[in-house]
Curated annotation (Swiss-Prot):
InterPro entries on file: APS_kinase (IPR002891), P-loop_NTPase (IPR027417)
Signal peptide range: none
Cross-referenced Pfam families: APS_kinase (PF01583)
A GO molecular-function annotation: ATP binding
GO BP, one annotated term: sulfate assimilation
HAMAP family in alphabetical order: Adenylyl_sulf_kinase
Pathway, per record: Sulfur metabolism; hydrogen sulfide biosynthesis; sulfite from sulfate: step 2/3
UniProt similarity note: Belongs to the APS kinase family.
Protein name per Swiss-Prot or TrEMBL: Adenylyl-sulfate kinase
Keywords, sorted A to Z: ATP-binding, Kinase, Nucleotide-binding, Phosphoprotein, Transferase
Coiled-coil blocks: none
Length: 201
């Protein structure tokens, strides 16, 4: 922390998280999608957001590539930069959940420790870790961005799943089979949100 941080204080505001959630008609939570590149994180998260939007739910999707065009454009792919990338996204997601939104995030987020830090920042009761479990061979077959091909050719270093480790969640709240149809996965997630009384529709 900076030396002047003792002069920076937290300001409480009259509008509470509960009041915002009441206005939206649902709880504010963070749905944290994690998995290998090509596992289907962004696809499933996007389909779920669309389904929630059609049900009148206030949402926002934070996508790994998109945030690197602005919020994290100064970061590379070193371990330190990846950690900072996830820290920033976690802070933004927490603020959005405070605003009463259902926040969907689609990030490889390969390390358990980083995901745990976000969980602690957001709050255990507002953080749902969703592991999109797709075999590496399937992810390579999909390879929508051609990244695996580059990594195998040695043109892309420190690529998760090839020459950088991915630490699968030990006990995710949701474990999805990434080889299933997206519509099936979305149905599973909607059922979960209803069971947990996060949404009502």
């Amino acid at each position: 922390m900076a030396l002047h941080d003792e002069n920076v204080v937290w300001h409480s505001h009259p509008v509470t998280v509960a009041a915002r959630e009441q206005l939206h008609g649902h709880r504010g939570v963070v749905l944290w999608f994690t998995g290998l590149s090509g596992s289907g994180k962004s696809t499933v998260a996007g389909a779920l957001e669309e389904a929630l939007h059609h049900r009148g739910v206030s949402t926002y999707l934070l996508d790994g590539d998109n945030v690197r065009h602005g919020l994290c454009r100064d970061l590379g792919f070193s371990d330190a930069d990846r950690q900072e990338n996830i820290r920033r996204v976690g802070e933004v997601a927490s603020l959005m959940a405070d605003a009463g939104l259902i926040v969907l995030t689609a990030f490889i987020s390969p390390h358990r420790a980083e995901r745990q830090l976000v969980k602690e920042r957001v709050g255990h009761d507002r953080f749902i870790e969703i592991y999109v479990n797709t075999p590496l061979a399937i992810c390579e077959q999909r390879d929508p961005k051609g990244l695996y091909k580059k990594a195998r050719a040695g043109e892309l270093r420190n690529f998760t799943g090839i020459d950088a480790i991915y630490e699968a969640p030990d006990s995710p709240q949701v474990h999805l089979n990434g080889e299933q149809l997206v519509t099936n996965l979305v149905s599973q997630l909607l059922d979960l949100l209803r069971r947990r009384d996060i949404i009502r529709s």
